[in-house]
Design a protein with these regions (language model features):
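Conserved acidic, metal-coordinating active-site core of Asp-based
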Residues: 1-75
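Asp-based, Mg2+/Mn2+-dependent phosphohydrolase catalytic module
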Residues: 52, 75, 79-115
Length: 115
C-alpha cells in the first residue's frame, strides 16, 4: 500500500530544477539551494480542524514565514508573519512579529493578550 507524500525537499540549483519533472505539483524555493514540493496545502488541514471542532473563521490564527505558508494567509483569519518571513507573506499578514528564533510566536501571543 502506497503512503501519501506530504512534503519533499530537493537539494538542487535553480538550473538543475528545470530538469525535475514536477508533474504539476506545487513547489517553492525553501532556501536558495533547496526546492520544496508540498502537494497538500496547509489551509486544507486547517479546514479539517475547523470542521471537526466546529470552529469559525474568527477563531483561527496562523503563523508563517515561508512561501509555503501563503495558502493559510486568508483575509478572514488572523495572520501573523514572522519577522524573518518572506516579503510577500509579510504583505499579506495582519501582524508582523519578531523573528522565529527571537520568540516571535510568544511575542505575538503576548501582544494580542492570548497569554
Amino acid at each position: 500500500k502506497a503512503e501519501q507524500i506530504y512534503k519533499i525537499f530537493i537539494a538542487c540549483t535553480r538550473k538543475e530544477s528545470e530538469e525535475i519533472p514536477l508533474h504539476g505539483l506545487p513547489s517553492v524555493w525553501f532556501r536558495e539551494d533547496t526546492l520544496l514540493i508540498e502537494p497538500v496545502q496547509k489551509e486544507r488541514g486547517i479546514f479539517e480542524i475547523m470542521k471537526r471542532y466546529h470552529l469559525n473563521d474568527e477563531q483561527i490564527v496562523v503563523f508563517g514565514d515561508g512561501m509555503n505558508d501563503c495558502s493559510m494567509f486568508r483575509k478572514e483569519w488572523m495572520t501573523v508573519a514572522m519577522g524573518n518571513g518572506k516579503a510577500p507573506l509579510k504583505e499579506k499578514a495582519k501582524y508582523i512579529t519578531k523573528n522565529a528564533d527571537e520568540d516571535g510566536i510568544y511575542e505575538a501571543c503576548r501582544h494580542f493578550g492570548w497569554i
